[in-house]
C-alpha cells in the first residue's frame, strides 16, 4: 500500500510532483519507491527550504541591524548625555573658578542664607516672592535694557511695568550695544596699544558710574526697603534674588543674546526703570539684598553706587547686584557682542581683560569654545552659557551660582569665564587654528604635493633647510656623500638620512608642504620649518601624513638608497636600468631623489656652506624644489623632486646664482616633465623601483641610465640617426627623430627598458630621461658616488666650473643641461643615456627653458661647446654612451640589440647613430650625414642648441663653447691635456672645436678646474631658462627635438663646416677628438669614412670618453681628456679600464689618454666596436662585430685610434689590465676623477685632490668626469648587474659599459660619476675587478 500509495499519489501528482516542492511526508512515502519525480520534488523542496532559510536569514539580519542601530543610537544618546554632563560640569567649573574670586564671600553668605532658608520654609516661601518678582523684573529689565521701546525710552521708571509690558508687546527694538558702549579701539591701533582699557575701560567705568548712580538711587531706596525687610527674609530674598538674578540674567542673556547690542543703553535705562519698578516689588527682596550687601560690605549703598564699577560689590545687594549684574551682564552681553565694547563691562579689568582678553581671545577663539554661541565676543555666548550654566548652577549650586548669576560673578565670571573659558577656548580654538594654519598649509599643500611623493622635494624643501644643517655633515662628507658613496651620501643620507631621512622625511613632508604651498612653502618654511623642525622630527605626523609616502619613500629610499648605493654602483646596469628603466628610473629617481635629496641637500648644504648660491641652492633648491615640487608635485613629486633635485640641484646650484625661479621652473618643468612622468611612473615605481633598485641599486640609477641611454641614444639617435637609430630602434623615435632626444631617449629607454614598449612612457621617460637623466645624472651623480650631488656640486661647480667660467648662463644651462647631459653623458653614457636624453630632453627642458634663449634644447651639447664638442660628443656620447647606455639599458633587455646598438653606438658614438647597426653603415653614412646634423642633434639637441641658438648657439657656443670645455672641466684641462695628449687625437681640431665649438676651451681648463670646483656651483641661469623652457619643452620637446634635428642637420652643416675644418677625421684618426673629431665627423658628413671613422672614433672617444668630452660634458671632460677623458669615458665606458685608465689617464693624462683611449676599447668592448667603428669606416660591421666580437672591437679601436691605439691598446690591454688595473685605476682614477670633481666633493675627494693635481686638466674633464665618475661610483653596481647582463662580452663591457658602459659612460657625463659608476659597473660587468673600483670609490 505504501508503494501503491506513493505511486498512485505520484501518478496523479506526477505532473505537479516534479513541478512543485514535495512535502516531507511525500518524500517519506516516496522513499521506498524513489523516482525522478521524487528527485524533482525533493529538489523543489530543498530549493524552497533554502529560499526560506535565506529569507529568514535576511530578516534576522535586518533585525540584528536594527538592533545594532538602536544600540548605537542608545550609545550615542548616552554619550550625548554624558557629554552634556561634562559640559555642564566644565561650565560650572569654569564659572565657579571665574566667580570664586568675586563670589567667594557671596557664595558663603548665600550658603548661609540657604541654610537659613532651609531652616525656615516660610522664609523660603517668602523668598520665592522676591525671586518671582526678580524674575519678572529681570524680564522687564531685559526688555528695557536689551530693547528700546519706541514709545518710551527706558528712563521712565514710573510706568515702567505697564510700559515695559506694552513695550514688549508693542515696539521693542534691540538696543544698539554700541551706543552706550562704543566699540573698543581697533586692535593694533595706537589707542589700543596705548590704553590699557583699549577703549573698554572708560565706557565700562562710565557705564558702571551710570549704573552706580542709578544703582545708588535704587540702592538707597532698596537699602531703605532692606532696612524694612527682615534679615532672614533679606537672606532668603537675597538667595531668591540671586536665583532670580540668575534667572533674570539668563533671561537677560537670552534677550541680550538676541539683543546683545540693544542691551547696553536700554539695559541701563531699563535697569533704572526696572530697578524703580523692581523696588516696589523688591522692597522685601531688595531690602534683603541691600541688607545683605550692607552686612557683607557695610557700605552697601556707597558701594552700590560703585558696584557697577566694582563687581566685587556683587554681594552688596542681590537686587542691586542683579541690576548691576544686569547692567554689567548686559554690558557683558553687550560686551559679548562687543567684546571690545567697553561701556558696559563694568569690570574694565575683566572686561578689557576678559572681554578685551576675551574679546581678543574671542578673536583668538578664547571665547570660541564657550563663546561659540554667536558672538565673536565670547562674553555674550558665555553670558548665555553663563546664563544657562547660571540657571543650571542656580538650580544645582545656587549659592555659588547665584553669585555667578549675580552681576559680579556673572560679569567677572564672564570675564573670567572668558579668561578661563576663553583660555580653554583659546587653547582649543587656537589649537585648531594653529594646526589649521599649519596643517592647512601643510595639508592643503601636502595633500596634492605630498601625495605625489614630492616628499623628496619636500624633503629638500624642508630637508634642505633643515637637512642642510643635518647635511652639513653630509656636505662635509660631500666627498663622503658624493665621493664617499652614494652609499655614503645615502649612508650618510641613510645614516644621516635616519636623521636626514627623518629630517628629509619630515622635510619631505615639510618640503612637500613647502611645495604644496610654494607661496606658503616659504611661509611654511618658517612655519613648516618650525613645524618641520618639529615636523622634521617632531611634526612628522603632519609632514609624514602629508608626506608619509614621501617619508616612506624617502625612508625606503634612505634604506634602499644605501642598499642601492651598492646597487647604484651598478647603478647603470642595464638589467636594472631596463627593468627599472621606468621603475628603476623612478626608483632611481627617487633613489636619486633621495640620494639627490640627500646629496643635493648635502650638496645644498655644501653649496649653502660653500656658497650663498649654495644657499640659493639649498634654499633655492628647496624653493626650486618647492616650485618644481609644487608643479611636479602632483605629477611626479618624488621623482620630480628627485630629479628636480637632481637636475635642480645642478640647475639650482647653477641656477642658484642665476635663477631661483627658473631653477624651480626648470626643475619643475624639467622635472615636472621629466620627473612628472617619471614621477608618475616612478612614483608608482618608487617603492618598487627602490625595491627593484635596491635589488638593482645600480638599476636604480641604472634604470634611469637605461632611460638615460635612451635619452642619450635619443640624442645621438636624434642627432645622428634619429631615423636610423630609431628606425632601427624605433621608427617612432625616428619619427620622434625630431623629438628623438625626447622620444629616442624615451624610446631608447623603452627599447632598452621596455623595448620601446612605452612610447608614452618612453616619452615620459624621455621627459623622465631628461629629468630622469638629470636625475640619473644626479642619480648617477648620486649613484656613482652620489655623483649627482657631487656631480651636481661638481657639476654645479664642476659643471658650473666647467661652464661656470664662461658659460655660467649657458653653462648653467649647459652645465645643468650639458653638464647634466654631459654628466648625464659622461655618466649617462652608462647612466646617462637618459641623462643625455635628459640633457637633451632636459636640456631641451633646460635648454628650452634655459635655452629658449639658447633655443637649442641641446644647450648641453648644442651649445657651441656642446654643439661642437658636445655635438660630436653628444652624438658619440649619446651614440656611444647613450646608445651604449640605451643599449646597456636595452642590453639588459636586449643585450645584443642594445649591444649592437650600443656597440654600434659604441662603435661609432656616431655609429650609435649608426648604431642602428641594422642601419649600420647607412646609419653611419646617414648618421655621418646625420651626425653633422645629429651630432648637433646628438649633441643633442646640441644642434638644437647649436642651431636654434645659432644666435644662441653663438651665445651658447660661446657660452657652450665654454660649456663643453666647462662640461669637460677636465676636458678643459683635458683640452689642455688633450692638446698635448690628444694632439695625437687630433685634439687640436678637437680643441678648435672646443675652442670654437667650446669657445671656452681656454675656459674649459679653468672651467674644468675652476669652473668645476665645488665652490663654483653651476649657475642656475641657464637652468632657469632650461626649467622654463623645460616645462614648455615638455610640450615643445618634440618640436624642439625636431627642431633640434633640423638644427642638428643645420648645425651638422655648421658643425661640419666647423668640425670638418677641424679635421673630424684627423681628430678621429687621432681618436682624441672624439668630441671634436666625433662631432666634426658627425658634422663632417662629407667624409663618411671620416664620418664613420669619426663616428667610430667619436663613438670610441665618446665611449672612450674623449668624444664624450664634447658630447658628454662629463665626456666633455672625457673629451677634455679627449682621449684622456676618452679613457675616463672609454674607461668610463669600459669604465673599469676606462675609469682606471681615466684615473690613470688623469694621472697620466697624455699617456693615459692615449692608453685609456685604447683602454676604453679594451675596457669597453662596445668601445672597441666603437673604436673599430672609429678605426674603420665600415666599422659598423665591426661595430656589430666589435660590439658582439670583443676582439674585433678591440682591434677596431686600435685602427680607429692610432693615437688612441695606445689609448685603445691600453684600454684593450688595460681592458683586461684595466679591468683589473682599470678597476684599480678606475678605483684610483675614478676615485681621482671623482676626487677631482665629484669625488673631490664626493667619494674620492682625496683621490680627487690627487687627481685634481693630475687632473688639473682632468679637473675640467673630471669636473664632468668627476660627476661622471661620481656616476661611475654609482655605476659600479649597475656594472655588476650589467656584468651579469652584459657580463658575457667586452661587448657587454663596451656595450655594457656603453650599454652598461655607455650608461657608465653616460653615467660619466651624467655625473661624471657615470664613469665612476660605469667603472664599478664595468667592474661588475666586465669583471669583479670593477667591484674593486666600487670599493675603490670608497665602497661606492
Curated annotation (Swiss-Prot):
<comment type="function">
    <text>Acts as a component of the WASH core complex that functions as a nucleation-promoting factor (NPF) at the surface of endosomes, where it recruits and activates the Arp2/3 complex to induce actin polymerization, playing a key role in the fission of tubules that serve as transport intermediates during endosome sorting. Mediates the recruitment of the WASH core complex to endosome membranes via binding to phospholipids and VPS35 of the retromer CSC.</text>
</comment>
<dbReference type="GO" id="GO:0005886">
    <property type="term" value="C:plasma membrane"/>
</dbReference>
<feature type="region of interest" description="Interaction with VPS35">
    <location>
        <begin position="356"/>
        <end position="1340"/>
    </location>
</feature>
<feature type="modified residue" description="Phosphoserine">
    <location>
        <position position="157"/>
    </location>
</feature>
<feature type="compositionally biased region" description="Low complexity">
    <location>
        <begin position="201"/>
        <end position="213"/>
    </location>
</feature>
<feature type="modified residue" description="Phosphoserine">
    <location>
        <position position="538"/>
    </location>
</feature>
<feature type="modified residue" description="Phosphoserine">
    <location>
        <position position="205"/>
    </location>
</feature>
<feature type="compositionally biased region" description="Basic and acidic residues">
    <location>
        <begin position="232"/>
        <end position="241"/>
    </location>
</feature>
<feature type="compositionally biased region" description="Gly residues">
    <location>
        <begin position="354"/>
        <end position="365"/>
    </location>
</feature>
<feature type="short sequence motif" description="LFa 19">
    <location>
        <begin position="1261"/>
        <end position="1269"/>
    </location>
</feature>
<feature type="compositionally biased region" description="Low complexity">
    <location>
        <begin position="546"/>
        <end position="566"/>
    </location>
</feature>
<feature type="modified residue" description="Phosphoserine">
    <location>
        <position position="1179"/>
    </location>
</feature>
<dbReference type="GO" id="GO:0036010">
    <property type="term" value="P:protein localization to endosome"/>
</dbReference>
<feature type="modified residue" description="Phosphoserine">
    <location>
        <position position="1053"/>
    </location>
</feature>
<keyword id="KW-0813">Transport</keyword>
<feature type="short sequence motif" description="LFa 18">
    <location>
        <begin position="1233"/>
        <end position="1239"/>
    </location>
</feature>
<feature type="modified residue" description="Phosphoserine">
    <location>
        <position position="209"/>
    </location>
</feature>
<comment type="subunit">
    <text>Component of the WASH core complex also described as WASH regulatory complex (SHRC) composed of WASHC1, WASHC2, WASHC3, WASHC4 and WASHC5; in the complex interacts (via N-terminus) directly with WASHC1. The WASH core complex associates with the F-actin-capping protein dimer (formed by CAPZA1, CAPZA2 or CAPZA3 and CAPZB) in a transient or substoichiometric manner which was initially described as WASH complex. Interacts with VPS35; mediates the association with the retromer CSC complex. Interacts with FKBP15.</text>
</comment>
<feature type="compositionally biased region" description="Acidic residues">
    <location>
        <begin position="219"/>
        <end position="231"/>
    </location>
</feature>
<feature type="short sequence motif" description="LFa 21">
    <location>
        <begin position="1329"/>
        <end position="1337"/>
    </location>
</feature>
<feature type="modified residue" description="Phosphoserine">
    <location>
        <position position="751"/>
    </location>
</feature>
<dbReference type="GO" id="GO:1905394">
    <property type="term" value="F:retromer complex binding"/>
</dbReference>
<keyword id="KW-0967">Endosome</keyword>
<feature type="short sequence motif" description="LFa 2">
    <location>
        <begin position="410"/>
        <end position="418"/>
    </location>
</feature>
<dbReference type="GO" id="GO:0005769">
    <property type="term" value="C:early endosome"/>
</dbReference>
<feature type="region of interest" description="Disordered">
    <location>
        <begin position="421"/>
        <end position="586"/>
    </location>
</feature>
<feature type="compositionally biased region" description="Low complexity">
    <location>
        <begin position="1093"/>
        <end position="1109"/>
    </location>
</feature>
<feature type="modified residue" description="Phosphoserine">
    <location>
        <position position="396"/>
    </location>
</feature>
<feature type="short sequence motif" description="LFa 20">
    <location>
        <begin position="1289"/>
        <end position="1298"/>
    </location>
</feature>
<dbReference type="InterPro" id="IPR029341">
    <property type="entry name" value="FAM21/CAPZIP"/>
</dbReference>
<feature type="modified residue" description="Phosphoserine">
    <location>
        <position position="876"/>
    </location>
</feature>
<feature type="region of interest" description="Disordered">
    <location>
        <begin position="987"/>
        <end position="1205"/>
    </location>
</feature>
<feature type="modified residue" description="Phosphoserine">
    <location>
        <position position="204"/>
    </location>
</feature>
<dbReference type="GO" id="GO:0071203">
    <property type="term" value="C:WASH complex"/>
</dbReference>
<feature type="region of interest" description="Disordered">
    <location>
        <begin position="1301"/>
        <end position="1325"/>
    </location>
</feature>
<feature type="modified residue" description="Phosphoserine">
    <location>
        <position position="159"/>
    </location>
</feature>
<feature type="modified residue" description="Phosphothreonine">
    <location>
        <position position="330"/>
    </location>
</feature>
<keyword id="KW-1003">Cell membrane</keyword>
<feature type="region of interest" description="Interaction with phospholipids">
    <location>
        <begin position="936"/>
        <end position="1340"/>
    </location>
</feature>
<feature type="modified residue" description="Phosphoserine">
    <location>
        <position position="287"/>
    </location>
</feature>
<feature type="short sequence motif" description="LFa 1">
    <location>
        <begin position="366"/>
        <end position="377"/>
    </location>
</feature>
<feature type="region of interest" description="Disordered">
    <location>
        <begin position="201"/>
        <end position="404"/>
    </location>
</feature>
